[in-house]
Amino acid sequence: MRAGVTMTAASEELTLHLQRVLAVPRSRVFHAHAEPDELAKWWGPKGFTSPSIEYDLRVGGRYRIAMQPPDGDLFYLSGEFREVDPPRRLAYTFRWEDPDPDDRETVVTFSLRDRGESTEVTVDQGAFATEARRALHVDGWTETLDRLEELIVSEV
């Protein structure tokens, strides 16, 4: 079930705020983000693959994800976990390793809340250097959440 997408651009910071309700328990959604083998099944926009994921899921632990677009070269994103609160929340820095001049490190918060037998997923990310970078991430996260939903709901 798709609950909708909300986008927020604060006056001082460019951020994104996305929400989705998935018809599965919160523990299943958290597991999909916490386990590299699961993450590889849905991470990235439609058509992307994640052939390599290094994941040290603890506060201060690092991660590195290789992303492969359908018709392009492999690229990487990496960061550090700032908060690990199973099965409620993950917060981590997010940095492209070969950044565009308009890229900078952002912070992602992936929050999960019970909604009856479903789970409300909230993704917040920011602050972005430009509106164009924020818009790219809104598109990327929207497709990524679509893939997460397809994976999890297909199991039910």
Which residues make up each language-model segment?
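Beta-strand/loop substructures that line and gate deep hydrophobic ligand-binding cavities in soluble
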Residues: 91-142
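Hydrophobic ligand-binding cavity/cleft-lining segments
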Residues: 1-49
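Short beta-edge strand/loop motif at the mouth of beta-sheet-based domains
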Residues: 17-18, 37-74, 156
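Hydrophobic pocket/interface hotspot
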Residues: 29, 39, 63-65, 81, ...
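Short amphipathic alpha-helical signal-transduction/dimerization elements
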Residues: 34, 145-153
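A short, structured loop/turn motif at beta-sheet edges
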Residues: 26-27, 58, 82-89, 111-120
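Charge-dense, helix-prone N-terminal extensions
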Residues: 2-5, 11-13, 53, 58, ...
